[in-house]
A protein has these predicted regions:
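Asp-based, Mg2+/Mn2+-dependent phosphohydrolase catalytic module
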Residues: 1-5, 18, 40, 107, ...
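N-terminal helical cap/lid subdomain that shapes the substrate entry/recognition surface
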Residues: 2-104
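A short, Lys/Arg-enriched amphipathic alpha-helix followed by its capping loop at the start of a domain
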Residues: 26, 30, 34, 109-118
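Residue-level marker of alpha-helix boundaries and capping positions
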Residues: 61, 100, 122, 178-179
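Long, charge-rich low-complexity segments
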Residues: 76, 117-120
Length: 238
């Protein structure tokens, strides 16, 4: 039976995409006010900066660094990077963190898992510092028994090493752990390849209607469905 649940963080425990767009726009307002740069110029420079960073750094935690994105954005705009990059970074994450909330039903599930002595892990791509800040903002300090970031693991999902590090920290075998994540390839198939059970958390919206789970992969669209599914996998239910 299941003894631990490992969650992906972004877009699994809360709505990352919506906050990312809103935080990006918030930085855009700052750039337009301070530098007189148009929305289109800012957007184009940011896209170039993000792509260049990812191409340079590959599949690493640092490739997600907003500090690097904003520094390069200014460089592409022919502006000295020290002039505004730190303020852009702080504006982005300030807005982001101030507006974070768990998905409906997530808190109830976490409490139910705690009552059944089911351990909870979080396994996430990105830098440890900002993921710690997110989890604190979500009020999960007392919920998480194990945290693994790709910065710590040295690899990103779906590499088996990041999942194996979670198992080492939990001191459990792969068969005793279920992974819950929103990305079918990185989270779900990566976890399955590492020997874990897995559930695809897949809220249905206009951008995801065409994606389908393959045969044998459990999929849920909200936390009520996830609660009901996990209840059948945990001794004594939830």
């Amino acid at each position: 039976m299941i003894k631990a649940i490992i969650f992906d963080l972004d877009d699994t425990l809360y709505d990352y995409k919506a906050l990312e767009r809103a935080a990006f726009d918030c930085v855009g307002e700052l750039v337009r006010e301070r530098l007189g740069v148009s929305e289109e110029q800012y957007g184009d420079a940011f896209k170039r900066a993000r792509l260049a960073t990812k191409e340079k750094l590959g599949e690493t935690a640092t490739s997600h660094s907003r500090m690097l994105y904003f520094q390069k954005t200014l460089e592409y705009l022919d502006i000295r990077p020290l002039y505004l990059a730190l303020e852009m970074y702080e504006t982005y994450w300030g807005f982001f963190l101030d507006n974070m909330n768990l998905y409906p039903g997530a808190r109830e599930l976490l409490e139910a898992l705690h009552e059944k002595y089911i351990r909870v892990g979080v396994c996430t791509d990105l830098l440890a510092h900002i993921q710690h800040r997110k989890l604190r903002r979500l009020g999960m300090m007392d919920d998480v028994d194990c945290l693994v970031t790709s910065e710590e693991a040295g690899v990103e999902k779906p590499a088996p090493g990041i999942f194996n590090l979670c198992l080492e920290k939990l001191r459990l075998s792969a068969e005793e752990v279920c992974f819950v994540g929103d990305n079918l390839e990185r989270d779900v198939k990566g976890a399955i390849a590492a020997g874990l059970q897995a559930v695809w958390f897949h809220p249905v919206d206009e951008t995801s209607q065409e994606e389908k789970a393959e045969d044998g992969i459990d999929a849920v669209s909200n936390y009520q469905e996830l609660y009901e599914l996990l209840a059948g996998e945990i001794e004594g239910g939830l």
